[in-house]
Design a protein with these regions (language model features):
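Paired acidic/hydrophobic, glycine-rich loop segments that form the ligand-binding mouth/hinge
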Residues: 29-35, 143-147, 163-165, 254-255
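Hinge/capping helix and adjacent helix->loop/strand transition within the periplasmic-binding protein
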Residues: 21-31, 41, 45-132, 144, ...
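Early extracytoplasmic/lumenal segment of secretory-pathway proteins
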Residues: 2-20
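Short helices/loops that flank or line small-molecule/ion binding pockets
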Residues: 17-27, 113, 117, 131-141, ...
C-alpha cells in the first residue's frame, strides 16, 4: 500500500477496549481490529452489557491463522506431564493458582474445564497480558500458567519453562513433543482459536475488498506464513463469508464450553 501501517496496541478488559475503539472509527477509514475469539465470542457470551454488538458493529474481513494456548509450568515444577500435574494439584491443600491473559479468554475456559474434569482446585488469576502472568509464575506468585505456543517455545529453549499439554485439534509443528489434551483423554479442548481482522460496521465494499485482497497476499508470503507457524498458528486465508460462517459455528461450541467449564466473568 502507499500508506504506512501503524500498530496501536490497546490491552486490557479482555480485549473490550480494543474492539470498542473500532466501533467509533469512521467506516471509510483504514483502521481495523486484529483480534482473537475473546472479543467477539467469549465476551459476548460472558458479558451481557458489552459496549458493542459483535455482529452488527463490525465487518468481517479475514481469518489469517488458527491455533490454541498450552498449559505450562516452571522448569523446576515437581511434575513433568499432565497426569503428574493433576495428581500434584489434587494433593495441594490450598490448590494451585494459574494466570491467563483475561477473564473469558480461551486459557481461562480451558483452565476451568480442566478443574471440572479433574476435581483439582485450580484458582484463576486474570492478567492484562501474558507476560505479566508468566513473570509472576517465575517469581512464585503463581503455580502455573497458560501460554501462546511461540512464547512457550522461547521460554522452553531458555530452560525456564515446561509445556504439559496443548489445546486444539492436533499437535503443533513447532512443538511436536507436546501432546494435546484430546489425546490424553480430555474432552472439550479441541476448539481452535484464530487470528482475525474486523473493520467497522458498514465498511464500503471497495475498502473491504482492498483489505481482504491485501491480507490474502500477505498471508501467502513465505516469510509471513513462517512467522505465523513460529507463533503456533497454522496460516489460513478466509473470505469474509467464510469468516462469518466460522463465527456462527464457533459461537455455540464456545457457549457450550463455557457452560461445561462453569466459567463466569469475575
Amino acid at each position: 500500500w502507499s500508506q504506512a501501517i501503524v500498530v496501536e496496541p490497546k490491552p486490557g478488559a479482555s480485549g473490550i477496549i480494543a474492539a470498542d475503539t473500532i466501533t467509533h472509527t469512521n467506516k471509510d477509514s483504514y483502521t481495523v481490529l486484529m483480534t482473537m475469539p475473546i472479543t467477539h465470542i467469549n465476551n459476548a457470551i460472558l458479558q451481557p452489557k458489552l459496549p458493542y454488538d459483535p455482529v452488527k458493529d463490525f465487518t468481517p474481513l479475514s481469518i489469517v491463522g488458527t491455533g490454541g494456548p498450552m498449559l505450562v509450568a516452571r522448569a523446576d515444577a515437581p511434575y513433568n506431564n499432565l497426569q503428574e500435574f493433576i495428581e500434584y494439584a489434587k494433593k495441594s491443600p490450598k490448590g494451585l493458582t494459574y494466570g491467563t491473559w483475561g477473564n473469558g479468554s480461551a486459557a481461562h475456559l480451558f483452565g476451568e474445564l480442566l478443574k471440572r474434569q479433574t476435581g483439582a482446585n485450580l484458582i484463576h488469576a486474570p492478567y492484562k497480558a501474558e507476560a505479566a502472568a508468566h513473570n509472576d509464575m517465575f517469581g512464585g506468585a503463581l503455580d502455573f500458567a497458560w501460554a501462546n505456543p511461540s512464547t512457550a517455545r522461547a521460554l522452553m529453549a531458555g530452560g525456564k519453562l515446561k509445556a504439559l499439554a496443548v489445546s486444539g485439534t492436533r499437535r503443533l509443528s513447532i512443538l511436536p513433543q507436546v501432546p494435546t489434551f484430546t489425546e490424553l483423554g480430555f474432552k472439550g479442548f479441541d476448539i481452535d482459536s484464530w487470528i482475525g481482522f474486523y473493520g467497522p460496521a458498514q465498511m464500503p465494499p471497495a475498502v473491504q475488498e482492498a483489505w481482504v485482497s491485501a491480507l490474502t497476499k500477505i498471508t501467502a508470503m513465505p516469510d509471513v506464513a513462517a512467522r505465523l507457524v513460529s507463533y503456533g498458528f497454522e496460516p489460513l486465508v478466509s473470505t469474509p463469508a467464510q469468516f462469518a460462517e466460522r463465527y456462527q459455528r464457533d459461537y455455540p461450541r464456545t457457549a457450550q464450553l463455557i457452560k461445561e467449564a462453569g466459567a463466569t466473568f469475575q
